[in-house]
Amino acid sequence: MDIEAYYQRIGYKNPRNKLDLESLTDIFQHQIRTVPYENLSIHCGESMELDLEAIFDQIVRRNRGGWCLQVNYLLYWALTTTGFETTMLGGFVCGSHTDKYSTGMIHLIVQVTINGRNYIVDAGFGRSYQMWQPVELISGKDQPQVPSIFRLREEGETWYLDQIRRQQHVPDQEFLNSELLERKTHRKLYCFTLQPRTIEEFESANTYLQISPSSPFLDKSICSLQTPEGVHCLVGLILTFRTYNYKENTDLVEFKVLTEEEVEEVLKTIFNISLGKKLVSKNGNLFFTI
């Protein structure tokens, strides 16, 4: 695996020897704007691999994306290889509809330490929940970013990441009540501890998310990519464009329903990916928001 191939994949051309917060943010933003958060392999009859070589081949060589375990594992490898001080952490995701955290550790997170300060770097939450900058590991501090305000809070040995969101405007009346829309302005995202993890600890979660009837990743085909203005999401045949803060404290969310024949072209032109196998688009009944 070649680190320069990774940097070419994400379009990063700046110096590699600056291990500061500015460089970390720059690398991170290049990845989230070029590597989609997606689970399309499942809906092409393939498996979501957790082996680093397989992930590198999928994302770097074949120009695909991946879900959190894949894109954050690749980011962890890239930052470590570049020379950053990194730690792999594990998260427990909060369900928006249940307001409860998962019992299993199903989310991979990267911690980066720079000049004694710790930052959470997560390229794999996608949709409008995706951070655009590293979040400093400080309890109770609002950290405003373009997508929203992020806030970490510490209780005992557990850290909780929350999001304070803007209002949203949906111009198409047909989609005002869409179940894909996040209704909460204060959203709990996930919790984690600072215990270092290894990739082997995520193998059971990687399998579970592909086979469990309660997994939204089995229930829905998902592709999400950050843009300079917002985020594009494709869930089944429903394509959305979110523009952050298009007017004061309000996001613009536009919907479009695709035909099966349009999906391949949309993946190429909007998400910059091509699939090697036939995609069976799916948007089942499990709760999932963008």
From Swiss-Prot:
Q: Which InterPro entries match?
A: Arylamine_N-AcTrfase, Arylamine_NAT_domain_sf, Papain-like_cys_pep_sf
Where is substrate annotated to bind?
I106, H107
Enzyme nomenclature, EC number: 2.3.1.5
- Any idea which UniProt keywords this protein has? Acetylation, Acyltransferase, Cytoplasm, Transferase
Q: What's the chief localization of this chain?
A: cytoplasm
Which positions bear N-acetylmethionine?
Answer: M1
Q: Which reaction does it catalyse?
A: an arylamine + acetyl-CoA = an N-acetylarylamine + CoA
Positions with a binding annotation for CoA: T103, G104, Y208, S214
Cellular component (GO) terms are: cytoplasm
Do the record's keywords include Disulfide bond? no
Q: Name one GO molecular function term.
A: arylamine N-acetyltransferase activity
- So where's the catalytic machinery, residue-wise? C68 (acyl-thioester intermediate), H107, D122
Pfam families with a match to the protein in the record: Acetyltransf_2
Main EC class the enzyme belongs to? transferase
Subcellular location(s) of the protein: Cytoplasm
What protein family is recorded? Answer: Belongs to the arylamine N-acetyltransferase family.
Full protein name = Arylamine N-acetyltransferase 1
What gene does the UniProt entry assign to this protein?
NAT1
